[in-house]
Amino acid sequence: METDFFEYSRQKIAKDKATGRCDVANNRGAALKCLSKFLGKEELTFGELSLEMMTQFKEWLNANGRKESTVRLYLYQIHTLYKEAEKEDIAPHLPLLSGIKLPLPSKQKCELLTEEELRRMRYADLSDFRSQTFARDMFFFSIYCRGISFTDLAHIRKSDIKGFTLTYTSQVLTPPIVTVQWDAAMQAIADRYPSATDYLFPIIKSDDKITKSREIGRVRENITKALKLIATRCNLSIVPSLKMTKDIYKRAIDSVSVSKII
């Protein structure tokens, strides 16, 4: 009997959760759940998977009101799981998405805080509200870390820092190993929030994978609320968000002349 794709995928998702890659596990789980609804069953051999099935699955997702970004995410999750099975010689070689058009969303210009607003926010006196001070520090730490995701930020361990280098294992990126320069500004932020655990910041307190994900989500939500209050206090043109930190970092790098560095 051929190996079942759903059973194989569930095992992969369990491994993702066991290694702390909760975001990856959640995305794969959502894609698998939708595929099950489309098929009306939870059994599917690798031999039954086909380009035609993926085309029909895409049409079904579109017909059920899924956004293009969601359709693309789900199809790529199924494709990635299949490719992993290929590498393990469990599934035959098959270009599962060959010919399926998955147009990238049009790149919309993201509104960012101006440099003057960033300075105003950075040096504002927020000492009367610890939650706002913490939110600001996490916002700028994310920028200093090249726009690190909050999930990855929460998972940084003290042992990841060696001298002037931070090397961490990303929960959301592939390849997962990321190295950035560790500087005085980042150290100053870390010093303000001593952690009693192996993690750099006091965000994750549990060893349970599911509880970890909830802790991260709760702190992220509190930061989002605090950033909205900061926007009002600092008279910012837009509300700062953790999602914009990568674009702010890229803008800063793009504005630097290489000839002034080398």
Give the residues covered by each predicted segment.
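N-terminal helical hairpins
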Residues: M1
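N-terminal core-binding DNA-recognition domain of tyrosine recombinases/integrases
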Residues: R10-D23, L32-K109, A124
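Short, charged phosphate-coordinating catalytic segments
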Residues: K83-I90, S142-G163
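Basic, Lys/Arg- and aromatic-enriched nucleic-acid-binding interface segment
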Residues: G99-F150, A154
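Short, contiguous acidic/charged loop-to-helix segments that flank catalytic cores in large enzymes
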Residues: L126-F129, T167-I177, I210-V219, S237-P240
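Short, basic (Lys/Arg/His-rich) helix/loop patches that form interaction surfaces
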Residues: R130, T224-I261
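Conserved tyrosine-mediated DNA breakage-rejoining catalytic core shared by Y-recombinases
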Residues: H155-D191
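Active-site/catalytic core of tyrosine-dependent DNA strand-transfer enzymes
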Residues: Q181-I238
